[in-house]
Amino acid sequence: MITRKLMLYMTCFTLTGLATTARADDASPPQSTLSVGLAGQSLPRYSGSDKRRWQVVPLVQARDGAFFLDSQKGIGYDLQSDSGLYLEHTLGYNLGRSDQDSDWRDGSDKLRGMGNIKATVNTAFAVGWTLTPWLTVEGKATLPLSDGQGVNYQASAILIPMQTTSDTVAFSTAALFGDRRYMNTVYGVSDRQSERSGYAPYQAAGGFYGTDSSLTWSHQFTPSWAALASVDYTWLDKHAQNSPIVFRHNQTSATLGVLYTF
């Protein structure tokens, strides 16, 4: 359950191109906007899977001043200072993981006997600093509210090597961390799960468990129509990599999306 901003936290994947553009632009303060669209994704069936799936997800982004709604991050608000420091707080939803193949959330038949990871409401706090118009650093913590699945953290940097009136290229990289409960929810195999699935028991240690990097290009066709393309690479460290349910420790995802802004 790698945090994709792509995160798409729906999990995975993180769609951050437009948000990155907004933070990097030191023009006018946020105004009321509404954008809707669709994105197609090719991604692993779950964090550590060696199989892939395709999915189409709706994109909704609405903002009124400091408050926003985002189909990937949830609802929230952000506060920004003239110095470049900002605080973001969101309330979102994680779809969990199934122990069979799924077309709409993480899951695989290879996890049969492991049981499902419940969907959960979560809250996330992020603190960042836009050091220059082309470089932002951020720390983020995501905590579950409706189920005790542990806390995950990430420390990230976003670099914008190119930005014009119509095109933005952004590169982001993040170090991923999780407490012991989170790591064992996602990568651990309990004695009971071992008996039911046939996998060897495994207790994952908390701490650093991987990196997540993405390259995103967004293009503004007209004031209303925009498109984005993103490629994401995730690498799992030994604390996750040594789990018997991890069959591939380096994974890629790809996203293509179209947005219409009213």
Model segments located where?
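Cleavable N-terminal export/targeting peptides
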Residues: 1-33, 49
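Short glycine/proline- and aromatic-enriched beta-strand/turn motifs that initiate or cap beta-hairpins
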Residues: 25-77, 86
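Outer-envelope beta-barrel architecture signal
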Residues: 28-34, 54-56, 65-67, 83-87, ...
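Residues on the lipid-exposed face of transmembrane beta-strands in outer-membrane beta-barrel proteins
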Residues: 38-42, 58-64, 73-79, 125-129, ...
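Structural signature of outer-membrane beta-barrel domains
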Residues: 43-45, 94-98, 144-146, 176-182, ...
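Outer-membrane pore/translocation modules
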Residues: 71-170, 180-206, 239-240, 246-248
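Predominantly the C-terminal beta-signal and adjacent terminal strand-loop region
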Residues: 171, 218-262
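Glycine/small-residue-rich hydrophobic helix-like segments
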Residues: 191-238
